[in-house]
Amino acid sequence: MKRTLLVTLALACAAPGFAHAQRIAPMKAGNFARLCTRATSAGICDAYIGGLTDGVSLSKINDRNEGDPSAPAGFCVPTTETMPVMRSKVLAWLKAHSETLDKPVGESVFAALHASYPCSVKK
């Protein structure tokens, strides 16, 4: 009985580690770049970039609609920036960093936005 309790407790303590796994889109950055260069799919590309941008911005907000304003931001896109400009910056970054084209799209687009829209560091 004591052994069963210890095993159950050990499994319960280990379980939260599995809860942090997140789904990663299977699309590669190279396929995304090809999609973004077609006029017929520019809207899909813009929606993905906008969704990633929103997700990063909203990731500081918890389930009580509270956030940590001191948490570092991954990138800072000005509110006046247009989606076509954002798309062109992401595509230019991907073109300049061809080693990332086999990586997951989210990782590469995040890196492109991070490089293209750095945040001011407050001292």
Identify the role of each PLM range.
Residues 4-13:
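Sec-dependent N-terminal signal peptides
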Residues 84-123:
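Surface-exposed, polar helix/loop patches in the mature regions of secreted/periplasmic/lumenal proteins
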Residues 5, 79-81, 105:
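Solvent-exposed, flexible loop/coil residues
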Residues 8-9, 47, 112:
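Residue-level signal for well-ordered alpha-helical scaffold segments within enzymatic catalytic domains
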Residues 27-95:
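Short N-proximal segments of mature Sec-exported proteins
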Residues 15-21:
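Sec/Tat signal peptide C-region and signal peptidase I cleavage site
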